């Protein structure tokens, strides 16, 4: 109910006021949630029947990006080049009906070895407002999945209902997180490992993000460095888990002319990648989400079902 009211009145509330309210809520919540954010020790438990990462790597590194608005597309190539500088690959998720998604950009990224995913349908916050609403949007979402040859989905604002999401034609979903009490739907899955969601269609892999989102750290909390990312990453490596990050090119600036109040320097992201590559050289499996989904599915098909510890 509260979420429905929020998205109804949100268009009428000035952006600066929205940010002011969210920042104050986070400031209050952060003190209360210090024992579960950014690290929830429970989430580091190894799942039942877990197997080692491919090639005996110590942990998985998964880079994903949600392109929130049309202008964000203009920064995708710059962002991809930063990752290429370090020999890394990632996925870019676009919102099909919020802006015109550039087929030229999609083709460019695909040809460079990046993955394309579907991010919600129009990002209006209403996808999960009712089962009827969700099911009415399934045909369109599936249409874009097929048209883009995409196999992965992420809902707007990390809203999620895994029973409903399983009705999409996907191999994986990434609309959840291990722990994030600052999200509109704050129920984390409490694991830093991927897991299989079984359903009547066979199932799909769920890939929760495990590093805090950039918008939370740099826009709402106004941090100016990658220290929390690095601290959480080190903990994930220690546990042998999956370091999955979700960033937004929309909020990055690559030169001073693009600086703004809802921007943070792309150098912070570059700093994180440099840290990973230098400190953990040869120890990580940098997988595309679809590759990770196949890994999880193969384990499940071998009757070694990955189960979360409840």
Roles of regions detected by a PLM:
Residues 47, 76, 80, 103-107, ...:
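Generic structural signal for well-ordered alpha-helices
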Residues 27-115, 157, 161, 221:
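Active-site beta->alpha N-cap acidic-glycine motif
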Residues 27-38, 48, 140-244:
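Active-site-adjacent pocket scaffolds in enzyme catalytic domains
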Residues 60-62, 89-91, 113-117, 152, ...:
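Structural preference for beta-strand elements that scaffold enzyme active sites
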Residues 44-47, 229-310:
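C-terminal domain-boundary segment and adjacent tail
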Residues 68-74, 93-104, 124-135, 152-163, ...:
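Acidic-and-aromatic substrate-binding clefts and catalytic sites of carbohydrate-active enzymes
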Residues 1-38:
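Membrane-proximal basic amphipathic "stem/tether" segments
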């Amino acid at each position: 109910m509260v979420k429905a009211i929020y998205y109804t009145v949100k268009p009428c509330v000035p952006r600066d006021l929205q940010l002011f309210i969210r920042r104050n809520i986070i400031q209050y919540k952060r003190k209360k949630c210090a024992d579960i954010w950014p690290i929830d020790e429970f989430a580091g438990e190894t799942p039942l029947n877990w197997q080692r990462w491919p090639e005996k790597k110590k942990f998985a590194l998964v880079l994903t990006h949600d392109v929130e608005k049309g202008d964000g597309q203009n920064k995708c190539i710059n962002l991809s080049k930063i990752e290429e500088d370090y020999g890394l690959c990632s996925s870019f998720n676009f919102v099909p009906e919020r802006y015109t998604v550039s087929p030229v950009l999609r083709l460019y990224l695909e040809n460079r070895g990046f993955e394309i995913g579907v991010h919600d349908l129009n990002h209006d916050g209403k996808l999960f407002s009712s089962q009827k609403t969700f099911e009415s949007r399934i045909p369109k979402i599936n249409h874009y999945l097929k048209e883009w040859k995409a196999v992965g989905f992420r809902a707007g604002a990390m809203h999620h209902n895994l029973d409903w999401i399983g009705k999409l034609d996907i191999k994986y979903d990434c609309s959840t997180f291990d722990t994030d009490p600052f999200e509109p739907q704050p129920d984390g899955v409490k694991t830093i490992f991927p897991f299989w969601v079984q359903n009547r269609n066979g199932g799909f892999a769920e890939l929760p993000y495990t590093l805090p989102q950039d918008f939370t750290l740099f826009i709402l909390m106004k941090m100016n460095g990658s220290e929390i990312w690095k601290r959480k990453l080190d903990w994930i490596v220690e546990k042998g888990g999956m370091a999955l990050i979700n960033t937004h090119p929309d909020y990055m600036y690559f030169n001073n002319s693009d600086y703004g109040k809802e921007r943070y320097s792309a150098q912070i992201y570059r700093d994180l990648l440099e840290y990973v590559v230098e400190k953990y050289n040869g120890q990580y499996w940098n997988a595309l989400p679809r590759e990770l989904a196949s890994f999880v599915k193969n384990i499940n098909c071998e009757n070694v079902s990955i189960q979360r510890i409840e």
